[in-house]
Structure formats: structure tokens, C-alpha cells
A protein has these predicted regions:
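C-terminal ends and interior cores of transmembrane alpha-helices
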Residues: 93-118, 329-331
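Flexible cytoplasmic inter-helical loops of multi-pass small-molecule transporters
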Residues: 219-245
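Central cavity-lining transmembrane alpha-helices of secondary-active solute carriers
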Residues: 60-77, 297-310
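Extracytoplasmic
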Residues: 18-52, 273-278
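Cytoplasmic helix-loop-helix junction between adjacent transmembrane helices
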Residues: 123, 129-167
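Helix-loop-helix hairpin linking two adjacent transmembrane segments in secondary transporters
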Residues: 164-225
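Extracytoplasmic gate region of multi-pass secondary transporters
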Residues: 37-41, 253-304
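Cytoplasmic membrane-interface "Motif A"-like loop-to-helix N-cap segments
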Residues: 80-92, 315-328
Length: 331
């Protein structure tokens, strides 16, 4: 009985994997919206009269605040200072607000010629919503990583991270595959007999999913509070305290910069392609727009399968540097 009282909440495998499912689902919802506009590019040009410059401006918005306003760095500091519950809920609300603004922009007909910052009013507002969402989803990502460390430290941590990332990538695949069918399903035929796709419909679907994902994270916060109580009972700190000297240690660590460089090269090689991949299938290979997203939608399948596999392997044998080299060669 004494042993049972001393057992921490994260010693329960059922609870560990349950909370992982909750936060991983939240990330799946976020990744769905991240790439939902990619298959819609040809329709944006046809229905809303966007051009490639408008779309490029919009899709670049994801990094505006994260890069130029250093929001990810500030988000990390807030996470260390305020904890996963406060930061995670804040990130979820940012995602919902950003998606809501994006939906408003895409679903609203603005006066012809209305401009803001040199671009169409609709494009600028959609980009602003996407930029706000980008802050939320990236901060949510680092929050979920810290949650996994908190619950799985000394256990199946790499496998848990791999499964979380695989679940999030399911969101990417769903965005590429389901977006156009959703837009067509809710489309309409005008008085002249011409069919129009309903571009706002997939974004509204994302907004609903993000609300559900936020509820899932809210449910998680109760488990997190109980975990903190069980750690307090053991005399352990629920989370490591933030220290300013940690920042100095990170920026002077050569290993950190090497890993960061690898991530930059990976992101610059893969993710911009996904934004234009569906349109590339249509323009260059004349693929039916209804199916164009399915082809790049296959890209994350490898990550969905292999990321948990390599995570489990890392838990068993270590050798993280070797696995990173293998991953780089595969890329």
C-alpha cells in the first residue's frame, strides 16, 4: 500500500499514453490547418482572383512573427516561466483566433479594389490570421515536447515523441487529401449553371477541429495538475525552473547550432515544396485538381511510419548522432 501511495502519476502507462493521445490530437488539428491552403491554390486563383504573388505573400506569413518578432524564443521563455498549462492553453487560443480571422477573410467579399499594405484586403487579413496561427501552433509544438519530457522522462520518451510527430503528420496528409473534396462537397451551382467550389468550407472545418483540439488540451491540464501534485508529494520539482544563464549555455553550445542548422536545411528543403506541391501537380503534370493534393499527401506517410520506429530504436540503443546521420542521408 505504501508503494502505491509513492507511485507518481506518470508511472501509470495507461495515463502516460492517454495524455499523449490528447496533446498529439491537438497537434494533428494544428497541422491540418497549416497545410489546408496548399491544395486550394488553383481554386484561390479561379474563385477569388488571387495570383501567385498573393499566395506567396500569404504562405510566408507563417513565419512573420516567429522569425522577425522572435515569438518562438519568447514563447519558450514563457513556457519555462509559466509552465505547460498556461502556455499550452494560450497557444491553442492563438491558433483558434488566427484560424477564425483567416476564415473571416476568405469567406468575406470585400469591396473591389480594397487594399491593405499593398495587397488585397482579403489576402492581407488572411495572412495576418495565418501569422497569428503560426505563433500558436509553433508554441504548441514546443509545449507538447516539454509535456512529453515531463510524462515520459526515463521511460519511452523518444517513442512518445515519434508517435506525437507521426500523429501530427496525419494532419498534414488529411489536409492534402481531404481539402478539395470538402470544398467540392459544399460547393454550389450559380444561376448560370457554373459550379463554384466552397473555399471557406475546409477552413471552417479546421476551425471546428481546432476548437475540439483546444478542448482536448484543456482536458489534459487536469491530468497535468494531478501530476504536479504527485511530484510535489515525492518532493520533486514538477518542472525545471527557468534561469537566464540557460540562454547563454544554449547559444554557446556548438551541438545546438549544428542541430539547428540541420533543421533549417530540412525545413527549407521540404516544407516550401509542400505549399506549392498540389499546384505543381496541376500545372506541370496536368493532374486533376481533385486528386492533386493526394500525391504530395503521400510525402508524410514515410514520417508517420518511420518516426515512431526510429524513436523506439533510440530508446533501446541510444546513438542519437548516428540516427541523425541516417535520417539526413535518407532525406
Amino acid at each position: 500500500m505504501t508503494e502505491q501511495l509513492k507511485q507518481k502519476l506518470n508511472d501509470s502507462a495507461v495515463l502516460r499514453w492517454s495524455v499523449l493521445a490528447l496533446v498529439a490530437f491537438t497537434m494533428l488539428c494544428g497541422y491540418f490547418l497549416t497545410d489546408v491552403m496548399s491544395p486550394l491554390k488553383p481554386m484561390l486563383e479561379k474563385e477569388l482572383l488571387w495570383d501567385s504573388l498573393d499566395y506567396g505573400f500569404f504562405t510566408s506569413a507563417y513565419g512573420w512573427f516567429n522569425v522577425f518578432l522572435l515569438m518562438l524564443i519568447f514563447g519558450g521563455i514563457i513556457l519555462d516561466k509559466m509552465g505547460v498549462r498556461f502556455t499550452g492553453m494560450g497557444a491553442c487560443l492563438l491558433m483558434v483566433f488566427g484560424c477564425g480571422l483567416k476564415y473571416y477573410a476568405i469567406s468575406t467579399t470585400f469591396p473591389e479594389g480594397a487594399m491593405l499594405f499593398g495587397f488585397k484586403m482579403q489576402v492581407t487579413l488572411a495572412a495576418l490570421g495565418y501569422a497569428i496561427f503560426g505563433v500558436g501552433v509553433e508554441i504548441a509544438g514546443i509545449t507538447v515536447s516539454k509535456i512529453i519530457v515531463k510524462w515520459f522522462k526515463g521511460k519511452e520518451m523518444a517513442l512518445a515523441m515519434g508517435l506525437e510527430m507521426a500523429t501530427a503528420r496525419i494532419g498534414t496528409t488529411l489536409a492534402m487529401v481531404l481539402t478539395v473534396p470538402l470544398a467540392d462537397f459544399f460547393g454550389y451551382t450559380d444561376e448560370g449553371g457554373a459550379f463554384h467550389t466552397n473555399i471557406p468550407a475546409p477552413i471552417l472545418f479546421c476551425l471546428v477541429m481546432l476548437c475540439v483540439g483546444t478542448i482536448a488540451f484543456f482536458i489534459y491540464t487536469f491530468y497535468d495538475k494531478k501530476l504536479d501534485a504527485s511530484l510535489d508529494a515525492e518532493g520533486l520539482e514538477p518542472e525545471e525552473p527557468f534561469r537566464m544563464k540557460d540562454i547563454v549555455y544554449i547559444i554557446t553550445n556548438k551541438g545546438f547550432w549544428l542541430i539547428a542548422l540541420l533543421c533549417v536545411l530540412f525545413y527549407s528543403a521540404v516544407f516550401p515544396f509542400i505549399k506549392y506541391a498540389a499546384d505543381l501537380m496541376v500545372q506541370k503534370y496536368h493532374v486533376d485538381p481533385k486528386l492533386a493534393g493526394t500525391i504530395p499527401g503521400l510525402l508524410p506517410i514515410g514520417a508517420i511510419i518511420l518516426t515512431p520506429l526510429f524513436g523506439s530504436l533510440y530508446d533501446r540503443i541510444g546513438k542519437g548522432a548516428t540516427l541523425m546521420v541516417i535520417g539526413s542521408v535518407m532525406l
